[in-house]
């Protein structure tokens, strides 16, 4: 009886991976040990050492992302400060008033009451009788807050004011005109 020669091709019937170790190893990308920076502190430690020497590898979290709402407030503060700087350069603000307003990113009704005389003398507010008229947009402020005491009658033109600020100004005999 003649024996058949042994087959050269073994088809691995019944085997899951057919002699290739893992199912991932037959997908055409080689045995890479993970994608990207996988294993840089383990089996690819030399890659980490080389990249770290060049300064190309950062591990962990870095930096800080400011929340968007704070960015908006920061931009508003910057706009106020730029407007105040411009008014000072034009000669419309004296040093005291400039420093007073520059140190306050938001304007309270009490602060406005303290400084309204100076603003009137500098031409940034008008005084008719005992009523002061001021447009806070000229100073760069878009909102009036309600802290402090209000003793003078003021007619304030502003984009937005808190209910407490409106209440205090109206209690002193003035009014708030919201644009």
From Swiss-Prot:
- What GO MF terms are annotated? rRNA binding; structural constituent of ribosome
Q: Which gene encodes it?
A: rpl15
The protein's name is Large ribosomal subunit protein uL15
Q: Name one GO biological process term.
A: translation
GO CC annotation: what is one?
cytosolic large ribosomal subunit
Protein's job: Binds to the 23S rRNA.
Organism listed in the record:
Archaeoglobus fulgidus (strain ATCC 49558 / DSM 4304 / JCM 9628 / NBRC 100126 / VC-16)
Stated family: Belongs to the universal ribosomal protein uL15 family.
| Entry keyword set | Ribonucleoprotein, Ribosomal protein, RNA-binding, rRNA-binding
- Pfam family for this entry, one: Ribosomal_L27A
Q: Which domain of life is it from?
A: Archaea
Q: Oligomeric state and partners? A: Part of the 50S ribosomal subunit.
């Amino acid at each position: 009886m003649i024996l058949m020669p042994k087959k050269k091709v073994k088809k691995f019937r019944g085997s899951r991976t057919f002699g290739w170790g893992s199912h991932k190893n037959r997908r055409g990308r080689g045995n890479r040990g993970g994608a990207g920076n996988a294993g840089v502190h383990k089996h690819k430690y030399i890659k980490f050492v080389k990249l770290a020497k060049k300064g190309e590898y950062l591990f962990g979290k870095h930096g800080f992302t400011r929340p968007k709402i704070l960015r908006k407030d920061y931009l508003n503060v910057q706009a106020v400060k730029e407007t105040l700087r411009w008014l000072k350069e034009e000669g419309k603000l004296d040093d005291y008033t400039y420093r007073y307003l520059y140190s306050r990113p938001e304007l309270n009704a009490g602060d406005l009451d303290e400084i309204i005389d100076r603003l009137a003398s500098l031409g940034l507010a008008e005084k008719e009788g005992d009523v002061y008229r001021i447009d806070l947009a000229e100073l760069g402020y878009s909102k009036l807050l309600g802290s402090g005491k209000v003793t003078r009658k003021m007619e304030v033109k502003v984009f937005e004011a808190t209910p407490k600020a409106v209440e205090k100004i109206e209690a002193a005999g003035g009014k708030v005109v919201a644009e």
